[in-house]
Amino acid sequence: MEVHKETDQITDNTPTILGISCFYHDSSAALLKGTEIIAAAQEERFTRKKFDKSFPIESILFCLDQAKVNLKDIDLIAFYEEPILKWDRIYNTNLNYSRKLNIGKLFNWFNSKLRIEDEIYKNLKDYKGKILISQHHLSHAASAFYPSPFKESTIVVLDGIGEWACTTIGKGIDNRLELLAEQRFPN
């Protein structure tokens, strides 16, 4: 935090981050100031569609309203998984195990997920900033470690599946996360 002597205005240099999850199940958004969660919501709360996978525009608007900010105040948007790595798993798994690929479903997934940055900019026209694409298990680790009171922690992520990883072990120290080992699909 800085105080500008000329204006006595306080400037907070802590980044404001909008996290987005969509196009799979349980679309949601969360707004953070640094590592503090300011607001979070799942899209189904607003649409009343169970497991809603659409772009979480209502959740985003809710988070912005709760934090009393607009898209121009957002320093970074984070997306929860690396689509190209997930595409690699889906394509190779289906290619190896399915005699008849559902090309339509794969195309729809390809169109929305692999072009997620375009989708975000299209749906959030006022946002001109950066987009961070994070590995799925790193997203889980960050969501648990950063808001915790711990400066150091062992991290274990047990998940149905991320891009390829089903289980990941790592560590968090201060503001750093390191994933050390993973068990990959299909094992």
For the regions a protein language model found, what residue spans apply to each?
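Short acidic/glycine-rich loops and adjacent helix/strand connectors
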Residues: 1-187
